[in-house]
Amino acid sequence: MTPRTRADLETIPAYIPGKNFPGAIKLASNETTLGPLPSVRDAIADAAANANRYPDNGHVALIAALADHLGVATENIAAGCGSVSLCQELVQATCNDGDEVIFAWRSFEAYPVVTQVAGATPVKVPLTADHGHDLDAMLAAITDRTRLIFVCNPNNPTGTALTKAELERFLDAVPADVLVALDEAYFEYNRSDADGIELFRGRPNVVVLRTFSKAYGLAGIRVGYAVADPAVVTALTKVHIAFAVNAVAQAAAIASLAASGELLARTDGVVAERKRVRDALLAAGYEVPESAANFVYLPLGAHSGAFAAASAEAGVLLRPYGDDGVRITIGDPAENDAFLAFATSTEARSLANVAVRA
């Protein structure tokens, strides 16, 4: 006889991270190719020297630095072990068994996982034909059991982004007792007019999630944050796992904020490469939604798995999404060229069932 665990865990999908193989070019996990700045590495080393001490569970210095950086009050900020942990904490803080969490699909793969782990019911709303959020359908999906709505902007994995006007109309139509999480993990790559922090102001049912994993290059350290009404922040602290944001992560995040100008300037290069890669794929006959993130998406349908497998054989790792599509991280120019060499080949176009445009 084995110990009993929750029977419903059998129905919960496992989160599948991007793969990695020695010597391969990894364009599967939306990581930045550039490491931390010297000042950030120094902060990491200094914090590691005191690893025998517990971290600050209140994240006081980090929250103060974030408040100054964002122009919000400290009581509006909660920190977490990556923004994905805050996603789960939001579900735990808002939902009882059987309550509903709405999100677009496809969107961030963790949403159905964290929803079901908390005993809530995921409500998946299909994307539009152009691979963006169907906000009207999401509004129509709201019931008296809806407690939380995730809006991933830009959307992962499709890269599509909503405008300020679209989000304002949506947020103003959501009932005041339903929390809306604007998940802005890729905010720093988005050149549209939508800024979750500005949308949060004056809307107590809006929470903004951001991370240091992407543009700040701290994916391996795990630190993210939420900006929310003080009542929501208090609820998050009650479900937060003690000491989850370690001292090294807090120190690295503070140092990264101090160097944010230099770090965020790197995103301009990613945005330029994103356009170059997308233009080349369009010229090769692919459908490529316009992306506002550090990746592009190919909606290849049933051809997705074979395309990603062939790319791996060619030495470039991508992220397939079942029978929906393939996501390609924007790497450095040489990495992107390696992917484009594969994608524009006769073999790849045949696998993807695309033809060269006239």
Curated annotation (Swiss-Prot):
Gene3D superfamilies, per the entry: Aspartate Aminotransferase, domain 1, Type I PLP-dependent aspartate aminotransferase-like (Major domain)
Modified-residue entries (N6-(pyridoxal phosphate)lysine), positions: K214
Cofactor names: pyridoxal 5'-phosphate
Record-linked Pfam families: Aminotran_1_2
A Gene Ontology biological process term: L-histidine biosynthetic process
Protein's UniProt keywords contain Transferase: yes
Subunit structure: Homodimer.
Protein origin, superkingdom: Bacteria
Gene: pat
Function: Aminotransferase that catalyzes the conversion of aromatic amino acids and 2-oxoglutarate into corresponding aromatic oxo acids and L-glutamate.
Catalytic activity: an aromatic L-alpha-amino acid + 2-oxoglutarate = an aromatic oxo-acid + L-glutamate
PROSITE patterns: AA_TRANSFER_CLASS_2
Protein name: Aromatic amino acid aminotransferase
